[in-house]
């Protein structure tokens, strides 16, 4: 099959990062059903964390999607690729009404904003900022144009504008969060009546959605949004927050901002945080970590 060069490049990046995220499409289908629910009883029908039948399906599916011998995209050059699916997986898919083998899901807009930004740059448009509702930002810079980005921290079920960071040069960012931020988020989150949240950050190891922090900002001067997202996804979709892994990622050019209590921690030595939240009995401070 011959595809657009942008899609081919996306699969090249996925391959080079050793990622299996797009192959999780059948698992994402369950989460899409969950996110579209209007009440808890409906949501539980799709939730692998609460429904043992769904959990069993997810476990079986992961045995295939995490196995390159069961499913893999073969890149043939000249924008040609082939989707290889084993007979065993094809039979499993047929028996379980699986109709989608591939889905970029939450990562999709990362590739889209990168494509738009690169296309604009090729045509000498270097001013302005491209953002998406689900956390991707390409700040093009140009003529010293600055971008102020708010960083939030969830406290008692509400987002606190903990600090502000100014991007004074061209810079790309990915913002992970574990809560709905606008009406557009309704298809990417579900919040149970007890406050538990289901998000789009599915761990490919067990098929469960996770969030190691309520908020995590990752950014880079050199890498695009898709590269940042792939580098940081495992840091966020995790049972616990690994500070050492975050610092290691920062050494590779992808810096982080996150909260530890009321400390807004940042890894870039030259970064400046302002407008630290001081209200409602909360007093946020900034802390450089290295």
Task: Give each language-model segment a name.
Residues 1-290:
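Mature catalytic core of soluble alpha/beta enzymes
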